């Protein structure tokens, strides 16, 4: 079941970055895309340029998710909406940032899957694409954000088991550092945000949308479970040993 077998897609977090690039890529391939995000003005511009259908939606609003999405027949879900508030150590993090990060990245993602996935199961066709992160695979010194993406990793793997015997595929995309507005929002400090990209060439949003297209366009017999992408100069898994206090 390659892209040519699909007709519709829903992309959350579609107003910029990875979401916007994915809307453009799917639209170019003839897919009718529902582009969901909070910023109506950005969606209207994207709709004018791509022909997508704008859907104003905050994934923290549970009731709005179901009332808006329940009746849509979606073949491809790109579960992209997310943010990175709460990068401080957990015991220093702003309680509101903890709440917002987990509500958006985990609870919102789960409700979107529930709202759209039930129809996929009924029609016995579809592809769930969850945008995770290398932060969900490796410890990156961020308990809140890392655990939110770790939950997406676990959710994606468990969905594969729950959907066994159906024609519904599940893919998790795990990017490293991507040149989007993510860090500007995460740290709320332009200088710190700029430093996050010093010394290496970051991934682009199009790199991620290309990976999504690769997974979705695979023959039906192929389920690409996880794609991990990182800048060539970004690595993970180093060990640090701190000396014992004297």
Model-derived segments and their meaning:
Residues 15-16:
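Conserved glycine-rich cofactor-binding loop
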Residues 88-90, 97-99:
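Substrate-binding pocket helix/loop in short-chain dehydrogenase/reductase
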Residues 93, 139-147, 158:
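Active-site loop-to-helix junction immediately N-terminal to the catalytic Tyr of the SDR YXXXK motif
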Residues 113, 148:
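Active-site helix of classical SDR
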Residues 118, 161-164:
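Alpha-helical segment proximal to the catalytic Tyr-Lys
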Residues 133:
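Residue(s) in the substrate-gating loop at a strand-loop-helix junction
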Residues 172-173, 191-238:
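C-terminal helical subdomain
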């Amino acid at each position: 079941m390659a892209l040519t077998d699909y007709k519709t897609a829903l992309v959350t977090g579609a107003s910029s970055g990875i979401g916007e690039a994915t809307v453009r890529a799917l639209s170019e391939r003839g897919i009718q895309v529902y582009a969901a995000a909070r910023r109506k003005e950005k969606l209207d511009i994207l709709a004018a340029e791509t022909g997508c259908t704008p859907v104003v939606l905050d994934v923290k609003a549970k009731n709005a998710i179901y009332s808006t999405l329940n009746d849509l027949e979606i073949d491809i879900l790109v579960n992209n909406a997310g943010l990175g508030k709460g990068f401080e150590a957990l015991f220093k993090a702003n309680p509101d940032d903890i709440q917002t990060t987990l509500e958006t990245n985990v609870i919102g993602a789960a409700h979107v899957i529930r709202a759209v996935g039930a129809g996929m199961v009924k029609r016995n066709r579809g592809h769930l694409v969850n945008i995770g992160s290398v932060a969900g695979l490796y410890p990156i010194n961020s308990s809140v954000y890392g655990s939110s993406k770790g939950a997406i990793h676990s959710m994606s793997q468990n969905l594969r088991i729950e959907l066994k015997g159906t024609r519904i595929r599940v893919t998790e995309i795990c990017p490293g550092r991507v040149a989007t507005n993510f860090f500007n929002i995460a740290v709320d400090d332009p200088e710190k945000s700029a430093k996050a990209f010093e010394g290496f060439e970051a991934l682009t949003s199009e790199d991620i949308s290309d990976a999504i297209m690769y997974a979705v366009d695979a023959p039906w017999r192929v389920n690409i479970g996880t794609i991990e992408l990182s800048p060539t100069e970004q690595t993970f898994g180093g060990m640090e040993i701190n000396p014992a206090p004297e």
